[in-house]
A protein has these predicted regions:
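Metallo-beta-lactamase
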Residues: 1-64, 77
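C-terminal regulatory/interaction regions
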Residues: 66-130
Length: 130
């Protein structure tokens, strides 16, 4: 199934959109009944909102765990694509989506002091787990 793309955009390179997205899922779960008819932008309508929210949240937690392990050594954004998406991103049309979503996960860890970012002399950002 297609899920939301939670991305950092060039206008806010240090943003933490994943945190806001995860919190909004909690608020939705706490305020919207499970038995509402969900009309997603992609795929078919369904009932079972809370299960879908749990599934999406778990997917991001698993991705963050894989990312933490990958960051045992310094990595660039492009170096973590396979950890987050399970494959190389070799289609130009997907590169900006993958970069933005990878940055969202990296920034989430940086904002929680679970990773650091340093910029080298060539202006390349390198991320590493703390």
């Amino acid at each position: 199934k297609i899920s939301s793309n939670v991305s950092v955009f060039p206008t806010e390179p240090e943003a933490d959109p994943l945190h806001g997205w995860l919190r909004s899922m909690e608020r939705i779960r706490d305020t919207v009944p499970d038995d509402v008819l969900v009309l997603p932008a992609h795929n078919e309508p369904f009932i079972g909102l809370h299960a879908r929210l749990a599934y999406l949240g778990q997917g991001h937690r698993v991705s963050l765990d894989r990312l933490r392990r990958r960051l045992a050594q310094p990595r660039r954004v492009v170096d973590v694509f396979a950890s987050l998406f399970g494959r190389a991103i070799d289609e130009p049309r997907l590169l900006s989506l993958a970069t933005g979503e990878s940055l969202a996960h990296l920034n989430y860890l940086v904002h929680r002091d679970e990773a650091t970012v340093s910029v080298d002399d060539d202006a390349v950002a390198w991320y590493q787990a703390v």
